[in-house]
């Protein structure tokens, strides 16, 4: 992997779903939406001074949202929602944002 570059897309794991679940409330607050369905589909990572997770979320009704979550290197499992893109489709590629 190239430092700073994005990995190839991989199917979401239980760990990635847990990361997404931990920032769901923050995303709902920022988008003023309530997500009945919030399922991680796939993800990419980027190594920086921690790890950025770019996660494609199925939010129901054929709609998808891309979220970016930063996990620091403190070992305390601190997570921060640092970006999101709404109105995505299942076929939209995860890209840097």
Curated annotation (Swiss-Prot):
A cellular-component GO term for this protein: cytoplasm
Annotated localization: Cytoplasm
SUPFAM superfamilies: Cystatin/monellin
Gene Ontology MF terms in the entry: cysteine-type endopeptidase inhibitor activity
Residue interval(s) of motif Secondary area of contact: 46-50
Modified residues (N-acetylmethionine): 1
Site (Reactive site): residue numbering on this chain: 4
Keywords: Acetylation, Cytoplasm, Protease inhibitor, Thiol protease inhibitor
Signal peptide interval: none
Recorded superkingdom: Eukaryota
Entry keyword Cytoplasm: yes
Membership in a protein family: Belongs to the cystatin family.
PANTHER family: 2010005H15RIK PROTEIN-RELATED (PTHR11414:SF25), CYSTATIN FAMILY MEMBER (PTHR11414)
Role, per record: This is an intracellular thiol proteinase inhibitor.
Name of the molecule in the record: Cystatin-A
Organism: Mus musculus (Mouse)
